[in-house]
């Protein structure tokens, strides 16, 4: 008979009790009632929060947006074609966030920050919420440093500062994207991180922009976030927030960033589609009531941080498309009221060959001259006034046949100044070249030339200055002031080059 040892048995039982570890796992699950058009209605999910991510059986992720008494309205981040009625859905307990790191520079990603350029995974160990709160009043300081765009018309008359939000608005095919991409090209060597967000664009257009950045060496300091026209509405709606989160990562690390949203009209349309499918009540132009908040919470994230937070900045250039120049439509008026000014691009000017087609009369920068270097203020002060007077005179001159000499001179000067503002695409100018160009026009040195000769003359003058008078460039760069010495050097250069140019043209 086997001996039973009670102490041994009790030891074994005690050990088993000590090792016993019961885990209580609570999972918040629901059932799909209906799915279609990028929207799913879920029964259950009682404890789900607004904006929480939910996961379907097939791995598709969605965002819970509508919390109703008997069901939850979820927008899908994918096509949702393999989701079936009756399948289960699990709440994740997380809200949308993306990985962030320096390795994102030079890459093209989607709205979930996943690479779509075929260059492999992006290493990242830090996460940021896609929707993070904007900096408060105490965290900010007023804008005081210039963000040079490389376009004479903007840098002289509608200056943009670091931390500002300046809207680019105009009809389709007026060069809105060109203004934005030129600004990115001009940040080369300026220690500015750029983020270009393409929302609902044609894939070919995005590829063209990326190609331009690559050719011009701008991709190394740029991140492209792209959700093309065939992407689900949810991802088009999220893309700008993803771009802002990537830019914020650098802003809070004491760096200057520039973000371009191309364009917010498409984001508003994607949001309208989601809202209508979720059966939210439509408002003006069928947009939901909170479409203003959609854009305001995005654009308020652009800021110039205070010295306690490291003086980083995020400058936003949102783009909005108008229909037949109607600036009083719903989305344009909303975004105009949120931003610190707007650059208005006119189809008439574009078709008349004035490019960039900036309508200087109704474009404004509400930060203004705080965002200009002193040298630019000194030479460009008279430019806007002269152009405004010229526009008025030009309209008047169409009816009057015999004009006095002074009026004829003013018209001639205006035509040359307008010519001076024309620039080729992807050819941004350094600020010292702009100062020299404007000084030449405003002080009447172009009056001796024919209007057709102005562009050629200015291109050659800028080359002449850089090669023969490098001290001029050095003075403007180092002092940021248009000193007497700089003026003497510039006058000399203009005089020498004008003589040479006129001789050359006579041949």
From Swiss-Prot:
EC number, as in UniProt: 7.1.2.2
Reactions that this protein is recorded to catalyse: ATP + H2O + 4 H(+)(in) = ADP + phosphate + 5 H(+)(out)
Pfam family, one: ATP-synt_ab
Keywords, sorted A to Z: ATP synthesis, ATP-binding, CF(1), Chloroplast, Hydrogen ion transport, Ion transport, Membrane, Nucleotide-binding, Plastid, Thylakoid, Translocase, Transport
Binding-site positions, ATP: 170-177
Topological relation to the membrane, as annotated: Peripheral membrane protein
Keyword ATP-binding: yes
InterPro entries: ATP_synth_asu-like_sf, ATP_synth_asu_C, ATP_synth_asu_C_sf, ATP_synth_F1_a_nt-bd_dom, ATP_synth_F1_asu, ATPase_a/bsu_AS, ATPase_F1/V1/A1_a/bsu_N, ATPase_F1/V1/A1_a/bsu_N_sf
Annotated site, Required for activity, chain positions: 363
Molecular function via GO: ADP binding; ATP binding; proton-transporting ATP synthase activity, rotational mechanism
Main function: Produces ATP from ADP in the presence of a proton gradient across the membrane. The alpha chain is a regulatory subunit.
Family (UniProt): Belongs to the ATPase alpha/beta chains family.
Assembly with partners or alone: F-type ATPases have 2 components, CF(1) - the catalytic core - and CF(0) - the membrane proton channel. CF(1) has five subunits: alpha(3), beta(3), gamma(1), delta(1), epsilon(1). CF(0) has four main subunits: a, b, b' and c.
Name the UniProt record assigns to this protein: ATP synthase subunit alpha, chloroplastic
The organism of origin for this protein: Anthoceros angustus
